[in-house]
């Protein structure tokens, strides 16, 4: 009887856990983990399980209430009213839920985040980067930054839960910031088994130009320019005639906006560019300032390639935002085919190789795609353009490939064509007298074949690292008696090893960029032209020498 009772008790124990079992039990396994998070793309914010938030409804003026449930975002519309106090930065419009205290910011173009505090067009930082509010999230080692709101940073001195986090630019994101006034923007990374700080690879804005030009929309511009597009002189921000205006030196946050006892151009509301108040025909109005954006050529958000392939490495378009893909309509069938690579050198102009256009295609049969990582798969931020015209160098020799350069003008209804973003940007043109040391390491990129015998182009953008050959090694003698002129330069992979491991351009890469880093900016040194095979040991690729064509480029761009 006792044995039977003991068996019954044991069975009950299996069926009904003891009261304190839950203290040590590990119940949270699988997909429904309490660590499940949700990503709200419009605000680029990550939310934890059961967190809720408001967000604007797409293509609607309504607002919806969202909740993170097991990794899924569940939303429904709710009534809202205007916020009782300003909570949004950079000209964002604040709306508050009618029956609870949460709010949502309707952000102007170029700004995202819970409070419109993230500037998606900021591609570099000024001075120490204390006011940098861009989206760079990569450390100098290539490590990805950790979200400032992560619980692993709760004991760190700088995290998104500090009382003054918003002022410091910290929030529910992993973008580089400089909250402690260090030398430049930094972030936390996981390294060698622990969480530590590391400077970011965010590029610095060109020095010496901050007084004459502005970066992004000019929200952080603090120069002394004070003339408008009509050459009118700006009114001081503390002028008595501005009483009652939204943006004056009397605002509580005027210092943060750059407003004060001066008449310098500013952009306190996140408008398209710096502006100021002026008097026109005895009436108070405002005008944009007569300023140009700073050059951000050659700047990028480089991501270290993860996959090695024949001839190079798979890469992302953000590492080579100047890379263009040129397509041409098929002659006898619908659709289009990939033609060549190209390189964006200004908003409306792309350089390529002359030999790509031997068939003299009508301009309306050509298309240029910018911002694409995969050759035939559209990218999220890609930009597509028809061609207004293209110019092949008048002295191009289709036998020797001398003067192998062409210039394509993108079609646009305005003077602005390509819009700068993390995926689209220009490469710098070199100085006329540029002479780089022999064996300087440079980069090329393109959608070409992995090897000469392959029947297919690469599905994804590749990059390769090569070194500039001395002129004494860039001769006919070293290239099997092929003609080599002073308009060409040579570059190749100088490492020892089998041919399969060597980096090089290949068929399909033609017209693409060979860029070298000069003063932390990627500068266009060559245009991919021709070669003997692909990735052969001690056989360099041949490139059009861009410094020889600067006058030709500028003259044709002015026409």
Curated annotation (Swiss-Prot):
Disulfide bridge map: 38-68, 66-75, 83-94, 88-105, 107-116, 124-205, 145-187, 176-200, 213-294, 234-276, 265-289, 297-428, 340-356, 348-417, 442-516, 474-490, 506-534
Annotated PROSITE patterns: EGF_1, EGF_2, EGF_3, FN1_1, FN1_2, KRINGLE_1, KRINGLE_2, TRYPSIN_DOM
Every Kringle domain range: 124-205, 213-294
Residue ranges occupied by any Fibronectin type-I domain in the UniProt entry: 36-78
A family per Pfam: fn1
UniProt-recorded Gene Ontology molecular function terms: phosphoprotein binding; serine-type endopeptidase activity; signaling receptor binding
Propeptide: 18-29, 30-32
SMART domains for this protein: EGF, FN1, KR, Tryp_SPc
Marked site (Important for single-chain activity) residue numbers: 462, 509
Classification via InterPro entries: EGF-like_dom, Fibronectin_type1, Kringle, Kringle-like, Kringle_CS, Kringle_sf, Peptidase_S1_PA, Peptidase_S1_PA_chymotrypsin
Active site, UniProt feature: 355, 404, 510
Glycosylation sites: 149, 481
Means of activity regulation: Inhibited by SERPINA5. Inhibited by SERPINE1.
UniProtKB keywords: Cleavage on pair of basic residues, Disulfide bond, EGF-like domain, Glycoprotein, Hydrolase, Kringle, Plasminogen activation, Protease, Repeat, Secreted, Serine protease, Signal, Zymogen
Subunit structure comment from the entry: Heterodimer of chain A and chain B held by a disulfide bond. Binds to fibrin with high affinity. This interaction leads to an increase in the catalytic efficiency of the enzyme due to an increase in affinity for plasminogen. Similarly, binding to heparin increases the activation of plasminogen. Binds to annexin A2, cytokeratin-8, fibronectin and laminin. Binds to mannose receptor and the low-density lipoprotein receptor-related protein (LRP1); these proteins are involved in TPA clearance. Binds LRP1B; binding is followed by internalization and degradation. Forms heterodimer with SERPINA5.
Stated role: Converts the abundant, but inactive, zymogen plasminogen to plasmin by hydrolyzing a single Arg-Val bond in plasminogen. By controlling plasmin-mediated proteolysis, it plays an important role in tissue remodeling and degradation, in cell migration and many other physiopathological events. During oocyte activation, plays a role in cortical granule reaction in the zona reaction, which contributes to the block to polyspermy.
Protein's name in the database: Tissue-type plasminogen activator
Organism in which the protein naturally occurs: Mus musculus (Mouse)
Source taxonomy: Eukaryota, Metazoa, Chordata, Craniata, Vertebrata
């Amino acid at each position: 009887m006792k044995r039977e009772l003991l068996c019954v008790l044991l069975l009950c124990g299996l069926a009904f856990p003891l009261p304190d079992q839950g203290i040590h039990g590990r119940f949270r396994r699988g997909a429904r983990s309490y660590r499940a998070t949700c990503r709200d793309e419009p605000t680029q914010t990550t939310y934890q399980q059961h967190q809720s938030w408001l967000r604007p409804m797409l293509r609607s003026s309504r607002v919806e209430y969202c909740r993170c449930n097991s990794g899924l975002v569940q939303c429904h519309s709710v009534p809202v009213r205007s916020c009782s106090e300003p909570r949004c930065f950079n000209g964002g419009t604040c709306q508050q839920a009618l029956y609870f205290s949460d709010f949502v910011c309707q952000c102007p173009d170029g700004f995202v985040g819970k409070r419109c505090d993230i500037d998606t067009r900021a591609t570099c930082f000024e001075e120490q980067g204390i006011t940098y509010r861009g989206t760079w999230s990569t450390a100098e080692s290539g490590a990805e930054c950790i979200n400032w709101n992560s619980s692993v940073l709760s004991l760190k001195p700088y995290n998104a839960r500090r009382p003054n986090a918003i002022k410091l630019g910290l929030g529910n994101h992993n973008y580089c910031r400089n909250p402690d006034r260090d030398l430049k923007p930094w972030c936390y990374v996981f390294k060698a088994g622990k969480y530590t700080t590391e400077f970011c690879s965010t590029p610095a804005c060109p020095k010496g130009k901050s007084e004459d030009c502005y970066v992004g929309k000019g929200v952080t511009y603090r120069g002394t320019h004070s003339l408008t597009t009509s050459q009118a002189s700006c009114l001081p921000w503390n002028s008595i005639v501005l009483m009652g205006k939204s943006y004056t030196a009397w605002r509580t946050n005027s210092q943060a906006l750059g407003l004060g006892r001066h008449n310098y151009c500013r952009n306190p509301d996140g408008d398209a560019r710096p502006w100021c108040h002026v008097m026109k025909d005895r009436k108070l109005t405002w005008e944009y300032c007569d300023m140009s954006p700073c050059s951000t050529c050659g700047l990028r958000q480089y991501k270290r390639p993860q996959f090695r392939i024949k001839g190079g490495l798979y890469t992302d378009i953000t590492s080579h935002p100047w890379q263009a893909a040129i397509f041409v309509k098929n002659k006898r069938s619908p659709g289009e085919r990939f033609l060549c690579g190209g390189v964006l050198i200004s908003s409306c102009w792309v350089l390529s190789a002359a030999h790509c256009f031997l068939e003299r295609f009508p301009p309306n049969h050509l298309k240029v795609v910018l911002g694409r990582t995969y050759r035939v798969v559209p990218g999220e931020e890609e930009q597509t353009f028809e061609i207004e015209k293209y110019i092949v160098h008048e002295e191009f020799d289709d036998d020797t490939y001398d003067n192998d350069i062409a210039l394509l003008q993108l079609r646009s209804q305005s003077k602005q064509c390509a819009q700068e973003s993390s995926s689209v940007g220009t490469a710098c043109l070199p100085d006329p007298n540029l002479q780089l040391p022999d064996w300087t390491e440079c980069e090329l990129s393109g959608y070409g074949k992995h090897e000469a015998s392959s029947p297919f182009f690469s599905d994804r953008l590749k990059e390769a690292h090569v070194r500039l050959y001395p002129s004494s090694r860039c001769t006919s003698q070293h290239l099997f008696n092929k003609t080599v002129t002073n308009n060409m330069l040579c570059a190749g992979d100088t490492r020892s090893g089998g041919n399969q491991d060597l980096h090089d351009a290949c068929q399909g890469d033609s017209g693409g960029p060979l860029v070298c880093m000069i003063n932390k900016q990627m500068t266009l040194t060559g245009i991919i032209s021709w070669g003997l095979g692909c990735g052969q040991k001690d056989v360099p690729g041949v490139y059009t020498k861009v410094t020889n064509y600067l006058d030709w480029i500028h003259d044709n761009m002015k026409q």
